[in-house]
């Protein structure tokens, strides 16, 4: 029987079904739009929010530093590390163990020290803070300030993939160090060191690196005997170096 609009029951059902389909379509569109807005916010916001204060550092003294290396290339022992600038264990290594190694072995001509990039903490992040920080550090290295830039990165780090190493922040670190900003920005914007960083990563992976910091003495992985997941102590590394020097 037709209703007040003159529609049969079959036509009423068809109209109801069309309304439901339209409503479902609008809900789906709404979900997609909201999702896109959230993703856009997560990607864009870290690079538009205020940079905030930068904790300055006192420039260090690094014997025979050349880009991401330190010491005499002809030293009898080679020390290599693979690190991610968003890694808290790397920060601890850099601040508490590395200075002792530099003082006792690198500065004395016994060890040639090479830092390798191993950015992986940002693998599932759209902002790629580990990779961007790695490139920025190498751009600073062009001006002889790799190790100071490494220091300012760790000094200002306060969390993984939360905007600490957003592009604008990385530029602010370079400004704090007094770098030539035209040169730095040109290098940074071009992602100049991407291929070298990728090579570092692949080289580390081929050696068995899967976490950071990973430390090698003359190509031999340094292990903490207290546990395979523990970062080697200064004593662990020094013992390996001393053994290599004694050969």
Which residues make up each language-model segment?
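A generic structural signal for short, solvent-exposed coil/turn residues
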Residues: 18-19, 62, 71, 105
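A generic helix-loop boundary/linker signal
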Residues: 69, 123-127, 139, 187, ...
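A short beta-strand-turn-helix
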Residues: 60-77
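Structural alpha/beta surface segment adjacent to cysteine/selenocysteine redox centers
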Residues: 75, 80-175, 207-210, 236-242
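C-terminal cap of thioredoxin/glutaredoxin-like
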Residues: 2-47, 98, 171-247
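Ser/Thr/Pro/Gly-rich low-complexity linker/stalk segments immediately outside membranes or between
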Residues: 47-61
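Short, flexible, glycine/charge-rich loop motifs used to bind or transfer phosphoryl groups or to couple energy/partner
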Residues: 68-70, 104, 204-205
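Alpha-helical scaffolding within the catalytic cores
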Residues: 64-65, 97-102, 202
